[in-house]
Amino acid sequence: MVETYHQPAPRSAATGLPVSMKIFMYLLTVFLITQMIGSALFAVYLHRRLDKIEDERNLHEDFVFMKTIQRCNTGERSLSLLNCEEIKSQFEGFVKDIMLNKEEKKKENSFEMQKGDQNPQIAAHVISEASSKTTSVLQWAEKGYYTMSNNLVTLENGKQLTVKRQGLYYIYAQVTFCSNREASSQAPFIASLCLKPPNRFERILLRAANTHSSAKPCGQQSIHLGGIFELQPGASVFVNVTDPSQVSHGTGFTSFGLLKL
């Protein structure tokens, strides 16, 4: 007896999705994405449309309200007296609110203007005058890049700044001098910022000194003074130096001023 052996045929390898299925899935994906985008755009359009409808409805209500007021004024019989009185009362309240808002704004603007009038800016900046070579109190002039904000500060006799309003003031001075000129003594050059209160004696607020130099030609040196002080109405401030003949009066060398804080 002869037994025959038959080897089973190998299984075929698994194949992928059919082409038709791939096309279907692709089209389905495109459809879903398109639908999502379309839904989002429609939602935006609907939202804007609803806002526009709401605005139109409000305008229509305002138009109807104004039309009703007009009909009440003309005395049409289609409206009862009670309705007209109620509508007129609402309209009068609306007008009163508008007028109150306008009055409040006017009061605020008036208050700001009064506040500005009560606290005006006070400032002065003057330049040295070359004629002040014989007196220890430096003289000044309203020339060049000077400042005199208003009549609440004045330059009196070309020597002192006088204020007419009480307050805190920043007062400053810059004095430039030629340090190697023949001085009357070997004492240092001293610049003083002085105060003359009304009906009181003068007093020194600030003082600075600088030594002489033997440099040739003229060795220019500058002294700076500055501080914050309380001034009364009618108070005056001025600058005093030990040797006015050494002071340099060129452009920007020597100046004096104040500013109300």
Swiss-Prot record:
An example Pfam family from this entry, by short name, is: TNF
Topology: which residues are Extracellular?
A: 44-261
Subunit and partners:
Homotrimer. Interacts with CD28. CD40 ligand, soluble form: Exists as either a monomer or a homotrimer. Forms a ternary complex between CD40 and integrins for CD40-CD40LG signaling.
Annotated THD domain ranges read: 122-261
Its chief place of residence is: membrane
Q: What is this protein called?
A: CD40 ligand
- The protein's recorded glycosylation sites are N240
Q: Which gene encodes it?
A: CD40LG
Q: What protein family is recorded?
A: Belongs to the tumor necrosis factor family.
Function text? Cytokine that acts as a ligand to CD40/TNFRSF5. Costimulates T-cell proliferation and cytokine production. Its cross-linking on T-cells generates a costimulatory signal which enhances the production of IL4 and IL10 in conjunction with the TCR/CD3 ligation and CD28 costimulation. Induces the activation of NF-kappa-B. Induces the activation of kinases MAPK8 and PAK2 in T-cells. Mediates B-cell proliferation in the absence of co-stimulus as well as IgE production in the presence of IL4. Involved in immunoglobulin class switching.
Record keywords, A-Z: Cell membrane, Cytokine, Disulfide bond, Glycoprotein, Membrane, Secreted, Signal-anchor, Transmembrane, Transmembrane helix
Q: Which is an annotated GO molecular function term of this record?
A: CD40 receptor binding
Which CDD domains does the record match to this protein? TNF
Topological domain ranges for the Cytoplasmic compartment:
1-22
Which GO BP terms sit in this record?
B cell proliferation; immune response; inflammatory response; platelet activation; positive regulation of interleukin-10 production; positive regulation of interleukin-4 production; positive regulation of NF-kappaB transcription factor activity; positive regulation of T cell proliferation
List localization entries: Cell membrane; Cell surface
- Give the matching InterPro entries: CD40L, TNF_CS, TNF_dom, Tumour_necrosis_fac-like_dom
> Which GO terms of the cellular component aspect does the record hold?
cell surface; extracellular space; plasma membrane
From the record, give the transmembrane residue ranges: 23-43
Q: How is it modified after translation?
A: The soluble form derives from the membrane form by proteolytic processing.
The record's listing under SMART domains reads:
TNF (SM00207)
